[in-house]
Swiss-Prot record:
One of its GO terms (molecular function) is protein-macromolecule adaptor activity. The lineage of its organism: Eukaryota, Fungi, Dikarya, Ascomycota, Saccharomycotina. Belongs to the IRC6 family. This is Increased recombination centers protein 6. InterPro entries: Irc6. Keywords: Chromosomal rearrangement. Involved in gross chromosomal rearrangements (GCRs) and telomere healing. The keyword Iron does not apply.
Length: 237
């Protein structure tokens, strides 16, 4: 798949009643306090395997359904094509974004992840899980509903060890298939790997390593990276 545009933007959008939530969200997830700026250039996302530079787009709207109708028009196609991810912050019971997702996802680029962040504290995790079950296989994109509560910490994992809240959003960004990223040296990765590692962490590391392997254009470098990662992770299997 060859793209015509550099897909290196993440859009964070809220409707007007939740602008304060967006400000806190940007600080917590991206350590970004430049909320008065609509575009924050050259941000860095880094984990133990890679780092990538991206632009953070920050916006708000009066009504998300109206915004979606504008966003899916042909005129907005160039904007859609540069989006690595779109994060919508809203009250899902008021906005009911699931009613808009079908036409929205048809228009979105298939390599763009979409996260709907619910800030209504009356919404329980079971309700979020049901929405995720419905949409998990609807499109090839990553589409996920996430609960995020400012007034009280969100439990960061469920009974199965799956991440929730901000931790889950971080995981989505970590495992996104970035088209251009800088793979960290294997020696640095080796220093950061603990002596013991839980199974779910091993699985996440394998997923991240696989995506980074796919992003290395030079075949010999890719093979070398894969071999080194296999050697390191085999110590915990």
């Amino acid at each position: 798949m060859v793209l015509q545009y550099p897909q290196n933007k993440i859009l964070v959008l809220s409707d007007h009643p939740h602008n304060f939530s967006k400000t806190q969200f940007l600080q917590d997830l991206f350590h970004c306090s430049s909320t008065g700026i609509s575009i924050v250039k050259d941000q860095t996302w880094e984990n133990r395997y890679y780092k990538v530079h991206f632009d953070l787009y920050i916006d708000s709207c009066k009504d998300i359904p109206v915004w979606v109708e504008e966003f899916i028009t042909p005129e907005c196609e160039p904007l859609r094509n540069v989006m690595a991810g779109i994060i919508l912050i809203t009250d899902i019971r008021q906005t009911k974004p699931q009613e808009l997702l079908h036409q929205f996802m048809i228009a979105a680029h298939r390599n763009t992840f979409v996260v709907l962040v619910n800030v209504n504290e009356e919404v329980e995790q079971d309700e979020i899980d049901e929405l995720n079950e419905i949409w998990s296989n609807a499109f090839t994109n990553v589409i996920e509903f996430v609960n995020w509560k400012r007034s009280k910490p969100t439990v960061n994992h469920n009974d199965y060890g799956e991440k929730l809240g901000l931790d889950r959003i971080q995981e989505i960004i970590d495992t996104h298939d970035w088209l251009k990223c800088e793979v960290l040296p294997a020696t640095k990765i080796r220093e950061e790997i603990p002596n013991e590692m839980p199974l779910e962490q091993i699985i996440r590391n394998l997923q991240s390593a696989r995506l980074k392997y796919k992003s290395i254009e030079n075949s010999s470098e890719a093979d070398a990276f894969a071999n080194e990662m296999a050697d390191e992770l085999s110590r915990y299997l």
